[in-house]
Amino acid sequence: MIKKYEVMYILDQDLKDTKELVAKLDGILSEGGQILESNDLGLLDFTYEINHKKKGFYHIVIVQATTQAIKEFERIAKIDKNVVRTLVLNTQNIQNYEQSVVLSKTDMTKFEEEQREKKNFRKPFIKREEAATKENK
């Protein structure tokens, strides 16, 4: 049975030819189905170190595939040392889920802007002497 999936995988930062591995992994995903949307986000920093690495090549694919193709993808990704992490979401069962690689990029920029605003907020500094005089008045 063919279902819709959103697949994200991260490749090792030291990998010389990412296109070859991306083509291999996308080929496995498209067996018995088709790739609807594919986007390479490039080399991005990790929030925390993974296997003593600080960066990785992010790739997002929206695909209609069989469960066998997804299982084969996960098996190959676990074996290949150049694949750092994978995430597979079955989006067919999630209500009101909008699948778009572009949408996920815009959501991240909004999130980063909100975090920046929160980070820059500081309470005004009041010296102890000034605070004591305000309380006495």
Curated annotation (Swiss-Prot):
**Under the cellular component aspect of Gene Ontology, which terms does the record hold?**
cytoplasm; ribonucleoprotein complex; ribosome
Q: Which UniProt keywords apply?
A: Ribonucleoprotein, Ribosomal protein, RNA-binding, rRNA-binding
* Annotated region (Disordered), positions in chain: 113-137
GO MF annotation: an example: small ribosomal subunit rRNA binding
| Coiled coil regions in record | none
What residues form the membrane-spanning segments?
Answer: none
Is the keyword Ribosomal protein in the record? yes
- A Pfam family hit: Ribosomal_S6
What family is this?
Belongs to the bacterial ribosomal protein bS6 family.
* PANTHER family xrefs: MITOCHONDRIAL 28S RIBOSOMAL PROTEIN S6, SMALL RIBOSOMAL SUBUNIT PROTEIN BS6M
Please name the HAMAP family in this protein's record.
Answer: Ribosomal_bS6
Summarizing the function annotation, the protein's role is:
Binds together with bS18 to 16S ribosomal RNA.
User: What name has this protein been given in UniProt?
Assistant: Small ribosomal subunit protein bS6
**What is the species listed in this Swiss-Prot or TrEMBL entry?**
Mycoplasma capricolum subsp. capricolum (strain California kid / ATCC 27343 / NCTC 10154)
For this protein's source organism, the top of the classification is: Bacteria, Bacillati, Mycoplasmatota, Mollicutes, Mycoplasmataceae
